[in-house]
């Protein structure tokens, strides 16, 4: 009987681990992470768990660094903005 209980417990643990892997499989990050493990220059984690990487061409005082408009929406304090791709920085509204 002990072997059957051990087998059931082991099967449950393996199933739980597999489910966790599937759930996290499409995610690169969790919010509040800086994505340094994914992006060479850091970046932001989006709501869907994907890293948006900072541009390597960031100019100091250009606003928050960006690679896409989505990054500026997240970093401009919720007021929106767009990415000035020429300087790699956000223009916040």
Curated annotation (Swiss-Prot):
Its main location: secreted. The keyword Signal applies. Keywords: Antimicrobial, Disulfide bond, Fungicide, Plant defense, Secreted, Signal. GO terms for cellular component: extracellular region. The keyword Secreted applies. One of its GO terms (biological process) is killing of cells of another organism. It is found in: Secreted. Disulfide bonds join 51-83, 66-90, 72-92. Residues 1-25 form the signal peptide. Belongs to the DEFL family. This is Putative defensin-like protein 282. It comes from Arabidopsis thaliana (Mouse-ear cress).
């Amino acid at each position: 009987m002990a072997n059957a209980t051990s087998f059931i417990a082991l099967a449950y643990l393996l199933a739980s681990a597999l489910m966790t892997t599937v759930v996290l499989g499409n995610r690169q990050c969790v919010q509040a992470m800086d994505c340094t493990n994914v992006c060479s220059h850091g970046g932001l984690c989006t709501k869907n768990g994907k890293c948006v990487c900072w541009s390597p061409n960031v100019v100091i005082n250009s606003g928050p660094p960006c690679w896409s408009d989505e990054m500026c929406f997240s970093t401009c304090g919720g007021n929106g903005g767009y990415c000035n791709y020429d300087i790699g920085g956000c223009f916040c509204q």
